Amino acid sequence: MVQRGSKVRILRPESYWFQDVGTVASVDQSGIKYPVIVRFDKVNYAGINTNNFAVDELIEVEAPKAKAKK
């Protein structure tokens, strides 16, 4: 399950970040076509480091780390 904080691999071939790993910044639940915003370490040609993807264009590589209890 892709959720905020997950590390994901990109499967969209036309994407600048194809086969790269990024971190999920947010997941929109409203029913839009590309609900997952992914943030990357490197920027593309336009200087952008985030992009929206569909859930089926992503593979979760690592689950988010659990928050430490106080």
Swiss-Prot record:
Stabilizes the interaction between PsaC and the PSI core, assists the docking of the ferredoxin to PSI and interacts with ferredoxin-NADP oxidoreductase. Belongs to the PsaE family. SUPFAM superfamilies: Electron transport accessory proteins (SSF50090). Gene3D superfamilies: 2.30.30.50. It comes from the Bacteria. Pfam families: PSI_PsaE. Its main location: membrane. Signal peptide: none annotated. It is a peripheral membrane protein. The cyanobacterial PSI reaction center is composed of one copy each of PsaA,B,C,D,E,F,I,J,K,L,M and X, and forms dimeric and tetrameric complexes. It is found in: Cellular thylakoid membrane. This is Photosystem I reaction center subunit IV.
